């Protein structure tokens, strides 16, 4: 069974844009599947105020995913455990962001390209730590 129904509109995470007001607006135009902005796993674990704001659902009752970026296994594990206590439908692991501030930390696409085995271990860590209702919920 697919994660999203065929033909579904899915709003990808976009840093600086997919905040609560933006998600509310796209819902009015029929987008049923949305994500938070990309969230740094370390910032979530250390409870940064800006990060906690990004991770809020607000009054959004629709399908909502959270996207994490990171490369440190214990930090990713702890971030997934924190997400277990939040109300998200899916956890997305970012292995594609080319932004310099992400690549400098060997995260996103640089992590996937330079340490593919590490990226696999990171993904496995997230899957094993996640308690989302469906295992396909970690993508």
Protein language model features and the residues they cover:
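Conserved beta-strand positions in the central sheet of alpha/beta enzyme cores
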Residues: 10, 35, 65-67, 92-94, ...
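Extreme N-terminal starter segment of soluble prokaryotic enzymes
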Residues: 4-9
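Glycine-rich, proline-tolerant flexible connector loops at the mouths of alpha/beta enzymes
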Residues: 38-49, 95-116
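Conserved small/polar residues in nucleotide/adenosyl-binding loops
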Residues: 138-139
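Alpha-helix-loop-beta-strand connector modules within alpha/beta enzyme cores
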Residues: 54-65, 111-134
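Conserved alpha/beta-domain cores
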Residues: 13, 70, 77-80, 84-89, ...
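Glycine-rich, positively charged N-terminal anion/phosphate-binding segment
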Residues: 3, 14-86
């Amino acid at each position: 069974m697919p994660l999203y129904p065929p033909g579904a509109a899915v709003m990808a995470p976009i840093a600086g844009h997919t905040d609560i007001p933006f998600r509310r607006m796209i819902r009015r135009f029929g987008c049923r599947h949305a994500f938070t902005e990309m969230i740094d796993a370390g910032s979530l674990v250390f409870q940064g105020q800006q990060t906690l704001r990004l991770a809020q659902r607000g009054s959004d009752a629709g399908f909502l995913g959270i996207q994490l970026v990171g490369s440190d296994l214990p930090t990713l594990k702890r971030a997934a455990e924190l997400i277990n206590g939040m109300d998200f439908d899916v956890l997305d692991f970012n292995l594609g962001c080319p932004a310099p501030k992400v690549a400098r930390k060997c995260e996103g696409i640089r992590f996937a390209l330079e340490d593919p085995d590490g990226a696999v271990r990171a993904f496995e860590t997230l899957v094993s730590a996640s308690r989302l209702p469906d295992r396909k919920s970690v993508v």
